[in-house]
Amino acid sequence: MKEIKQETYLKWYEDMLFWRKFEDKLASVYIQQKVRGFLHLYNGQEAVLAGALHVMDLNKDRMITAYRNHVMPIGMGVDPKRVMAELYGKVTGTSMGLGGSMHIFSKEHRFHGGHGIVGGQIPLGAGMAFGDKYFNRKAVTLCFMGDGAVRQGSFHETLNLAMLWKLPVVFIVENNGYAMGTSVKRTANHTDIWKLGLGYEMPCGPVDGMNPIKVAEALEEAIKRARNEEGPTFLEMKTYRYRGHSMSDAQQYRTKEEVNEYRKIDPISQVKKVILENDFATDQEISNIDRIVKSKVLECEKFAEESPYPEKKVMYDAVYEEENYNFISHKLT
């Protein structure tokens, strides 16, 4: 892999900090009941996304994930204001306010969700890769999942067919240590999730998911293999989430001391340290980035607050092809 340049570190710092503050803002407005339903935040796992985006071809590669999905579409190029609006349930959101937290989509930016069913996105990711191979698009699908998803039957069925058909897909487990509140140690007789790929003779391995460089190195090789029609790869990103599984999680299954140990290797702090040690930016320039990030998050909040809610007819437009709803027994008001 080529040497990581100064501008990449600065971009990583600004992007990851923005994602962190974006999620923090969502937590704040959720408590104010401005965002409803479930809310699963990405705090701590930013290095996985940063490293992935660095080696993807954003003009043709795809991304699909589960419900911890707010900042991924932003990384793929979706306007963060529209993402924030979607969580508010506003019509200016990515799914006209109908999807909410767990169902953010952008066909234009090749971000295919946002799925609320554990493991439900895995067969879809392979299906998209099948389509790209069939039409010879030379595109690669990055299919993200949590550590809990690997206990679903669809995971194993998909890996089997993906390897059989040599599909251009990279399966990425973001192992943050817990499936909701259940430790990885309590779900199987071993904790090396990456070894599940061995049963399908699929290239696989563990990756330091708290370091964007390590993530980029592993994914660069996997994406190259997929694009060269050599088949899929299965990677386990060993990462950590600083917040609970969702906002309703009391986190009684872990200690504050455990969380603080992982904060010592915070991906944002690691990148900031490299920047300062190599004089890639001064303290003042770092402060300017912090100020810009704060301003951007406030702009997203303002946009979401001021956007209108969808009209009732939008619900039907999203489901039915016909414009005349006479077949519906009640009238729209």
Mark where each language-model region is.
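Conserved acidic/glycine
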Residues: 1-49, 54, 243, 247, ...
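A general secondary-structure junction signal
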Residues: 67, 237-239, 319
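Short acidic, gly/pro-rich beta-turn/loop elements at beta-sheet edges
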Residues: 73-75, 181, 245, 314
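Cofactor-binding active-site loop characterized by glycine-rich and histidine/acidic residues
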Residues: 24-27, 34-165, 183-189, 194, ...
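Glycine-rich ThDP/TPP pyrophosphate-binding loop and its adjacent helix/strand module
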Residues: 110-306
